[in-house]
């Protein structure tokens, strides 16, 4: 079993990264939280979770052990697979998810794509004893102006995650136009994931 991989980032897109180590390129599926942590660096260390089945062998990469632990907790819940767990971790920070589970906020989980009422309740029931928040989520770094590059990058990220271009453009444009205060690309994508 693999615990972590350390190497040079060869390719980085919002849902995956290719890391070269020992002349081998490893493709790892990642959350948007991990993606944003990797955007400004050339080499990294990611913690790994392996999914090995008859028809597939997938590697999931996480920026820290806490994110990996939450992922493993999420996929232990009936009805939550690796893709839904990754979508949850892309929509919420680790601190936000811990706080939602700990406080029993079913409606916050239901607002996420792929999570219905029963699944949200099940996540909270199954994980409430396993998850204890470290602290209250802190606000993200604010970017002074929303530029067209940020809008384009947000749309590209959503398309890469499997959403249609037209739906992605509509949602991102709506978020940007309704937001009189400045915001980050991460905040735009998280809001969009809740609306799609």
Curated annotation (Swiss-Prot):
Q: Which UniProt keywords apply?
A: Cytoplasm, DNA damage, DNA recombination, DNA repair, DNA-binding
List the Gene Ontology MF annotations in alphabetical order.
ATP binding; four-way junction DNA binding; four-way junction helicase activity
Family matches, as Pfam families: HHH_5 (PF14520), RuvA_C (PF07499), RuvA_N (PF01330)
Location of the protein in the cell: Cytoplasm
Q: Name one GO cellular component term.
A: Holliday junction resolvase complex
Q: Where is this region: Domain I?
A: 1-63
**Which region ranges are annotated with the description Flexible linker?**
143-146
* Keyword DNA damage assigned: yes
Task: Give the region (Domain III) as residue ranges.
Answer: 146-196
- Stretches the record annotates as Domain II: 64-142
Superkingdom classification of source: Bacteria
Residue ranges annotated as transmembrane are: none
Q: Can you cite a GO biological process for this protein?
A: DNA recombination
Give the matching SUPFAM superfamilies.
Answer: DNA helicase RuvA subunit, C-terminal domain (SSF46929), Nucleic acid-binding proteins (SSF50249), RuvA domain 2-like (SSF47781)
Q: How does it assemble?
A: Homotetramer. Forms an RuvA(8)-RuvB(12)-Holliday junction (HJ) complex. HJ DNA is sandwiched between 2 RuvA tetramers; dsDNA enters through RuvA and exits via RuvB. An RuvB hexamer assembles on each DNA strand where it exits the tetramer. Each RuvB hexamer is contacted by two RuvA subunits (via domain III) on 2 adjacent RuvB subunits; this complex drives branch migration. In the full resolvosome a probable DNA-RuvA(4)-RuvB(12)-RuvC(2) complex forms which resolves the HJ.
Q: Per its UniProt record, what HAMAP family does this chain match?
A: DNA_HJ_migration_RuvA
For domains, the record's comment is: Has three domains with a flexible linker between the domains II and III and assumes an 'L' shape. Domain III is highly mobile and contacts RuvB.
- Per the similarity annotation, which family is this? Belongs to the RuvA family.
Q: What does this protein do?
A: The RuvA-RuvB-RuvC complex processes Holliday junction (HJ) DNA during genetic recombination and DNA repair, while the RuvA-RuvB complex plays an important role in the rescue of blocked DNA replication forks via replication fork reversal (RFR). RuvA specifically binds to HJ cruciform DNA, conferring on it an open structure. The RuvB hexamer acts as an ATP-dependent pump, pulling dsDNA into and through the RuvAB complex. HJ branch migration allows RuvC to scan DNA until it finds its consensus sequence, where it cleaves and resolves the cruciform DNA.
Q: What is this protein called?
A: Holliday junction branch migration complex subunit RuvA
């Amino acid at each position: 079993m693999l615990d972590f991989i350390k190497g040079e980032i060869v390719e980085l897109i919002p849902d995956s990264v290719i890391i070269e180590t020992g002349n081998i390129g490893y493709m790892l599926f990642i959350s948007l939280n991990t993606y944003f942590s990797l955007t400004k660096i050339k080499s990294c260390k990611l913690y790994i979770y392996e999914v090995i089945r008859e028809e597939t062998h997938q590697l999931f990469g996480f920026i820290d052990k806490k994110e990996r632990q939450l992922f493993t907790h999420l996929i232990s819940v009936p009805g939550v697979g690796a893709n839904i767990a990754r979508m949850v971790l892309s929509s919420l920070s680790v601190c936000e998810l811990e706080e939602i589970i700990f406080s029993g906020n079913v409606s916050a989980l239901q607002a996420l794509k792929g999570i219905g009422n029963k699944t949200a309740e099940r996540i909270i029931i199954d994980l409430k004893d396993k998850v204890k928040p470290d602290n209250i989520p802190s606000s993200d770094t604010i970017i002074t102006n929303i530029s067209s590059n940020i809008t384009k990058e947000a749309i590209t990220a959503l398309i890469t995650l499997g959403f249609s271009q037209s739906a992605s453009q509509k949602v991102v444009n709506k978020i940007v136009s309704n937001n009189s205060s400045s915001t980050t690309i991460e905040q735009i994508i998280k809001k969009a994931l809740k609306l799609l």
